[in-house]
Amino acid sequence: MPIAEGRQPHQGRAAHTRSVRDGTLRRVLLAAGPVSSLLYVVATDGLAASRWDGYLRSEQMVSELFAVGSPGRDVLVPFTWLYTALFVAFGAGVWNSVHGNRALRIAGGLLTAYGLWNIMGALYPLTLGDETSVPMHILATNIQLALMVGAMCFVAAGFHGRMRWYSILSLLASALMGMVAFMAAPGPNLVLGIGERISIGAFLLWVAVLAVALWRRPLPAPAEERRHQSAR
């Protein structure tokens, strides 16, 4: 038996093992997306809001919970780092799930940047009662929103069928309600609180749906495994 033929079974098994390992890692990274969305809701409207007597979820901004001087800020500062790590992992999972699809690769890069930008947002929080903190906070928020919109647009471009339309509708809902909430600021009022939460919720849910869509998406076999299969 030629040496090359004797090596093929071993090489094939090694390629298959790497493929399984990479697939497992990819799914773990993708799972970080839905986990980050769930933790966001629990940490903000759950833990942080419960520490602020008189805080009205239906009328006040989520940003106020992160603000310097907020009773819930001590909960949300460590959460911000956890959320950042989870979302960056999710962005990497998207990137690793879409070989050969340029639009979805760009989306993965933008989602990773979105996650990292939470660090900048943490550096420029609102300060309760201090209007001078507002401009830089708005600038940091708008840059992150641009990353979010870009990612959703590229996902819509990279998919066909239901996921494309779901991404478009989610983007429209998030953007429209975000603009409505912005116009209702500084509040408090029902339009501000509910509108902002619909805007945020549309994005958080979209992240979970995207993770499921990519979880089900089969990856192309590695080049080495394809060569082994063609040699059989």
Where on the chain are the PLM-derived regions?
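Hydrophobic cores of alpha-helical transmembrane segments in multi-pass inner/ER membrane proteins
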Residues: 2, 79-90, 143-155, 202-215
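Interfacial helix-start motif at the membrane-water boundary
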Residues: 64-85
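Interfacial segments of alpha-helical transmembrane regions
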Residues: 26-35, 99-112, 163-170
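N-terminal signal-anchor transmembrane alpha helix
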Residues: 24-50
